[in-house]
Amino acid sequence: MIMRQTKLYPVVMAGGSGSRLWPLSRVLYPKQFLCLKGDLTMLQTTICRLNGVECESPLVICNEQHRFIVAEQLRQLNKLTENIILEPAGRNTAPAIALAALAATRQHTDCDPLMLVLAADHAIANEEAFRDAVRGAMPYADAGKLVTFGIVPDLPETGYGYIRRGDVVPGATDAVAFEVAQFVEKPGLETAQAYVASGDYYWNSGMFLFRAGRYLEELKKFRPDILAACEQAMRGVDPDLDFIRVDEEAFLACPEESIDYAVMERTADAVVMPMDAGWSDVGSWSSLWEISAHTPEGNVHHGDVISHKTENSYVYAESGLVTTVGVKDLVVVQTKDAVLIADRHAVQDVKKVVEKIKADGRHEHHMHREVYRPWGKYDSIDAGERYQVKRITVKPGEGLSVQMHHHRAEHWVVVAGTARVTINGEVKLLGENESIYIPLGATHCLENPGKIPLDLIEVRSGSYLEEDDVVRFEDRYGRV
């Protein structure tokens, strides 16, 4: 197969708000934005995995409420180039990939670019094997095939869908791909054992490679309603900082469907490229334990942990010391506002705990005590009747919106850095150990004019203290 000169356009799916890694994963800060292995988040690791593959800057698709998290993580990699598509609501993978394909064809009018579709929350141990599989699949995709990457199974996993391979694709290169004979739903154990023994089945990874135009052609053939809704949503694109904000009303009218059901199971041009790269979808605490580095006792430690007579356990300490004595096969995860203790073999039921938290009207499933904003972050240290205490960190050169509150007053004490505070038009500079009072109803603004982070303690007092008591008059992040 001879490839034409073409451009490879990575598309990273960063939607979703999974509950299986609670309490680390929350609705407002799901697992793809967490550092679970090493210093990079799962999203950042997914992007860096492409180092060594010649490609364009990635296009990331995410939920609107995660936009500033994604932007900051791309900025840290120097990959922020107006390349974030915001979904007003999740509509599964077929519509999301359609938005990316439409964006890619708009941006690259001189060619039909190859789209490498990746999930932001997968772990891959052998990254060179991953890159080899991508390079091997490119000639097939360039020739018009829709490539799905099939993971070579090393055990009879019942939690994944499978792909049964057919004949070798004619004209195969050194990297052999197979026609897709069948997509199979998650099997029972005996069936999965037979699949693995046969050598004809792969795990369905949810990673794809195809030309943007070919995907749109097949989507038009099999699900024209999805394509029409996405085209309408892209016609109403509203550029917003580094974001591509599609028309909300049009996209909400789009049917919800996966790419497997909408296209891959119907097209005559689906091929599977085998990949043996130590892949995991990190779908539970037990799978994270399996892919992490272990102590001689089989334990995985994160943070300040001391274990004694402990075996085959995962222990995560976010804040403070966590100790274990005389236990085995446990998952212990401690965050600032919640602790999970579970049998490592029963972690599939963590989602039931999350459902209970949600049903009880609590907030621990939704957000962490520490919350990230485009200007920095805040940590809710304490709260009681008619008061809240927060530690606020503002990044250098950033600032909060010009705002006012109907139901609360605020006291600010600068801990580190310099604060520029505007209250009812009067500007004051505050240094360390200086404080200021913001009366109820006052129009005010907080900025960091310095070169180091600004840290301050905020004490709120009033009859209603939640975040939605805010009226914004000006905002550099488009939140007015």
From Swiss-Prot:
EC number from the UniProt entry: 2.7.7.13
One Pfam family named in its UniProt record: NTP_transferase
Single GO BP term: GDP-mannose biosynthetic process
Keyword annotations: Capsule biogenesis/degradation, GTP-binding, Lipopolysaccharide biosynthesis, Nucleotide-binding, Nucleotidyltransferase, Transferase
Signal peptide annotation: none
GO molecular function ontology, one term from the record: mannose-1-phosphate guanylyltransferase (GTP) activity
UniProt keyword Nucleotide-binding present: yes
Pathway annotation from the record: Nucleotide-sugar biosynthesis; GDP-alpha-D-mannose biosynthesis; GDP-alpha-D-mannose from alpha-D-mannose 1-phosphate (GTP route): step 1/1
Keyword Nucleotidyltransferase: yes
Catalytic activities: alpha-D-mannose 1-phosphate + GTP + H(+) = GDP-alpha-D-mannose + diphosphate
Its biological purpose: Involved in the biosynthesis of the capsular polysaccharide colanic acid.
Family under the similarity heading: Belongs to the mannose-6-phosphate isomerase type 2 family.
NCBIfam families linked: GMP_PMI (TIGR01479), PRK15460.1 (NF012004)
Name listed for the protein in its UniProt record: Mannose-1-phosphate guanylyltransferase ManC
Native species: Salmonella typhimurium (strain LT2 / SGSC1412 / ATCC 700720)
Gene from which this protein is expressed: manC
